[in-house]
């Protein structure tokens, strides 16, 4: 809401409670606007599709990307906890399913006022990921946290409708990141980091880049070619994301994930440990390890 308010203050027209049903295509197949679920049609010189992981614009265009399939599953709940408010992210690496070390982690993220965000996430390169009941796994994780925190049970959280779960696309699931008339950003682009799942910063950065590239292209040539956006994204994140996709596949092997956990457990410095866990961030000095991960950051 803060970002929407800021955009509105700067002159953007904000349509609250409005959903896009799909794109408007011209006779040549170029995206020339959007159709709202209400049936209203809005024409546009260029569309920035930041319409989420299940992007109706991307689905309507039948986009095929060489990077499709990279994703994480995340589940979390906000709740009261009898623990001190601290300004740090607790990361728990021991996540197991039927004896296998999962390629993921759990987190406890303080919200202030005696409330916490507790959740977990794991990537879908693990061969049994579809067999995992994420709600049950979260319940087991909660049960393993200190009893003196007096946390609610998973059943109580479900009854209160406090549990949220989602599949997070990552590693650029729309590539190239544009088609004539449209540029993809955020989860519609699959902008989350393919190893850690950090998504908020990349959503904002890709949206900014898409806007700037759209303006530049419209000024210099028109909406049929946004190659400048491909170049911008590739220059900024291409090397990091290629490395991250390789890492995503690698940690899906339980023995490799377990070896990684043992290595991290041997690191006594919490700051270094966090940087090793969210290892992509060594190349991104603007990102704090405390803001990373599919839970608090996405």
What are these regions (language model features)?
Residues 5-152:
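Predominantly flavin-linked oxidoreductase catalytic cores and closely associated redox partners
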Residues 2, 6, 10, 209, ...:
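Generic non-transmembrane alpha-helical segments
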Residues 81, 114, 166-169, 190-191, ...:
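Active-site/binding-pocket entry motifs
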